[in-house]
């Protein structure tokens, strides 16, 4: 529960809401835009999933000077979805994205946030999870670390482009021109 019109203000405490949801088997909300910059929301996922049936993820960015709230592909968002995939918990997570930003085109904000989230989920799904678990189970820590490092440079971008191509969605930055055209043809004519 957040105060109306009061950004960065939370009524209650994280501990209270965690205990409330855990003792009543309720869905717990993690709002990625309301944590300290040194906290990584993904660190809470595996523990919470032991006690609550589902998670509601409000994926955004903290209040900053640059396009606040619009979801981007950053380490925090990628780590969040990697944690969900590694825990086999995508089916227990409900994802909502935040597109609030009065300084940029709303449709552009929507697409930037959606595409960034899709890229993070895809990169998490493409991680060689089975092999990493095998290394973990066998105590092969060097091999696990080496494979995790190699996975960072695997070409998920080509897979994302192919996915978009197969679904008749603009590939790469082609969507920018489509948004500009829509803005010219439609949104600029609104009062």
Regions found by a protein language model. Name each.
Residues 9-11, 18-30, 36-191:
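Histidine-acidic metal/acid-base catalytic patches
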């Amino acid at each position: 529960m957040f105060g109306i019109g009061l950004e960065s203000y939370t009524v209650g405490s994280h501990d209270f809401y965690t205990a409330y949801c855990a003792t009543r088997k309720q869905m717990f909300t993690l709002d990625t835009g309301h944590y300290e910059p040194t906290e990584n929301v993904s660190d809470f996922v595996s523990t919470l999933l032991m006690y609550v049936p589902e998670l509601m993820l409000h994926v955004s960015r903290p209040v900053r000077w640059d396009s606040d709230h619009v979801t981007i592909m950053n380490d925090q968002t990628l780590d969040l979805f990697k944690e969900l995939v590694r825990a086999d918990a995508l089916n227990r997570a409900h994802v909502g994205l935040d597109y609030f930003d009065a300084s940029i085109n709303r449709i552009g904000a929507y697409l930037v946030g959606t595409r960034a989230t899709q890229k993070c989920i895809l990169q998490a799904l493409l991680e060689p999870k089975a092999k990493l678990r095998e290394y973990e189970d066998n105590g092969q820590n060097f091999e696990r670390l080496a494979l995790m490092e190699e996975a960072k440079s695997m070409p998920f971008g080509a897979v994302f482009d192919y996915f978009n191509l197969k679904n008749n969605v603009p590939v790469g930055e082609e969507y920018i021109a489509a948004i500009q055209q829509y803005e010219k043809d439609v949104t600029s004519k609104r009062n």
